Amino acid sequence: MRKGMLVIVPLKYTGGNMWLELMQHIKSTINNSGAAFNVMLGAMRPQAAKVDENGVIMVIRGETTRGDNSIQSYLEQELYIEVWGRNDNPDLEVGYELIANLEDRFEAIINDLRKRCGELDETACILQNTGYQIIDLVCTSKVGDHDSVRPLVGTQYRFMVRLIDLKEKTNGGIF
């Protein structure tokens, strides 16, 4: 190659619409849990989301990054999941009790999903349309809303979801 020559390298496939199917899968998992949350994809101001005491969950797309590809290539998908509730009681502690209850219900659903993915339950861990498998989902932070929009109370979770492409050819080995 001559010095100063421009080389165009094709981009490696980075998941396509995997992120959308993952978000839809999490929404479906929450909806099918019977927890009575109103679940939506995407973020909006909580004041516009018709939040009530049953709770609203917003599943929000974050960054998609490639992981360590030395053995099997995988992707990491960042998701933000916000849980919101409404309590009009002037006693602020009652609002904290509400959001604590909503957090407990949400976390039980996610813990069950994580457990089922660890057990390789295909209905829990395989994204059928894109062919990705959820290897793990880990909460990396949990932040309250600092009472910024009372009577609404909320919590934002940050998750990293690790996925592998089941369609990828590994040439029969780990190297």
Regions found by a protein language model. Name each.
Residues 1-41, 45-48, 63-175:
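Charged, amphipathic alpha-helical segments and their flanking helix caps
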Residues 51-64:
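A short, hydrophobic beta-strand-centered structural micro-motif
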